[in-house]
UniProtKB/Swiss-Prot annotation:
Gene3D superfamilies, alphabetized: Phospholipase A2 domain (1.20.90.10)
Signal sequence interval, chain numbering: 1-21
Protein name per its UniProtKB record: Basic phospholipase A2
GO biological process: arachidonate secretion; lipid catabolic process; phospholipid metabolic process
EC number: 3.1.1.4
Glycosylation sites: 109
Biological role stated in the UniProt entry: PLA2 catalyzes the calcium-dependent hydrolysis of the 2-acyl groups in 3-sn-phosphoglycerides.
Location relative to the cell: Secreted
Amino acid sequence: MNPAHLLVLAAVCVSLLGASSVPPRPLNLINFQRMIQCTTRRSAWDFTNYGCYCGAGGSGTPVDELDRCCKVHDDCYGAAEKYHRCSPKLTLYTSTCSSQTGSVTCKDNGTKCKAFVCNCDRTAALCFGRAPYNKNNENINPNRCR
């Protein structure tokens, strides 16, 4: 085999091995991230470890209005799974953002699941836009969430 071909094959194998250790990002979270940035003008990463409910999981009593937005969003995703038999984190939909007004619109997505999930994300993103962001509630002690 040609040495150049071997080099390319080795590079592909190494890149695949490296990629296998990176967990795939749920596709819908990209849509939700865009909505959050539209309504808050903040990075969606600002909300990944906020309070008791923003980010993965959630328990206890929400620490403030923004954290309540996240709990409502979690509950909405639960309803999507239960009543619409869909996987919200994997459901792709179409929406538009007006960066001038901070408004988000869900487009006709063709299925009840897509429409429901888009509305879950839209409602949460608008709630994030209205709620104050308190830096003291970033990376809080998990004991506060019991």
